[in-house]
Amino acid sequence: MTKTEISGIAPFFIVRNVPVALSFYRDRLGFDITFQGPTEDDIFFGIVQRDAAMIMMKEIGVDPVPNYTRDIKKGIARWDAYLHVPDPDALAAEFQSRNVEFFHQIQKNTMTKFWMV
């Protein structure tokens, strides 16, 4: 059986405020907003894209609980997504130039060309 191509995958983040999150991804991280809605008066879902990377986000009416701590027994990891980029140092410098703040310092790991965000 031949394999059908999967051309990408997009993480889905629950956020406190979709318009604010969309602005952050556009203005600070350099993404393009490709969708926000379902209407101009009721924006609770959005999609951003930068090159081949896409992120979907949704507001659910209650504050999300971030996974910035690690508790394996409870099934909680401290990261939500990995970025694969040809030049992680350049991306880190770009984010620093845009005054992006992280809970933990961006780090290289043992996998080449991957950064934890």
Predicted regions and their residues:
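Vicinal oxygen chelate
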Residues: M1-T4, F13, L83, A92-V117
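Short, charged/polar surface micro-motifs in flexible loops or helix N-caps
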Residues: D51-I55, G61-P64, D87-A90
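Core segments of cupin and vicinal oxygen chelate
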Residues: K3, F12-M54
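Short amphipathic alpha-helices within nucleic acid-binding modules
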Residues: S23-F24, D89-E94
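A short, acidic/glycine-rich surface segment
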Residues: T34-F35, D42, M57, D63-T69, ...
